[in-house]
Amino acid sequence: MEPVTNATVYVVDDDADVRDALAWLLRSRRLYSESFASAEDFLKMVEERALPRQPQCLLLDVRMTGMTGLALFDLLKQRDGFIQTVPVIFLTGHADVPTAVQTVKQGAFDFCEKPFSDNVLVDRIEQALQQSAVYLEETAHRHALLSRLADLTERENGVMKLVVEGVPNKLIADQLDISVRTVEVHRARVFDKMQVKSAVELANVLRAHGQLPQ
């Protein structure tokens, strides 16, 4: 697994010793980190600034004074795509392991029981950052696809729908009451705008992003 570059690891723990130890560990593995002493401080940061479009993950203590890690996680889940962009790894004591298992079922990436092995934790962090990177890439591809679809004219959309259904040019021309040559022109424009070379490739791209015409 290739290490993820330009990544950020957020640490939320009310124990200063834990924050310092994690900051040192992450620095030693050449991972950039930002630490927060409370869930409230992290939530304030999230609300006040846009998160960078780069791989990120969150190390979150389960039990903290004030807002707990569980309460923060519930709030973050309500933000569209947040826990996919910033996978959450819970840091938990032995007594909280059953609770941590439940959070994984609810969308957390993983949990790590204290005291944790440095290598095990860093390995999980790297996996979370990989997942974040994949999600960001897929999201970027989806946005680019939607932008290309929005650039199609109404006629091009009509031709595209029939093309991905496998309808031959002659039948498309008959259905739309246009010439075969006009169909060929629109078909070529659709392929060009959608950056594909065949009807099969076009259908696969649309299907992969849930945009296949009904």
Model-predicted regions and their roles:
Residues 19, 60, 65-68, 75, ...:
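The feature encodes the CheY-like receiver
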Residues 96-98, 112-125, 171, 175:
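C-terminal output helix
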Residues 70-84, 102:
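Short amphipathic alpha-helix used as the core "switch/output" element in two-component signaling
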Residues 188-214:
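Basic, Lys/Arg-enriched C-terminal extension of HTH/homeodomain DNA-binding domains
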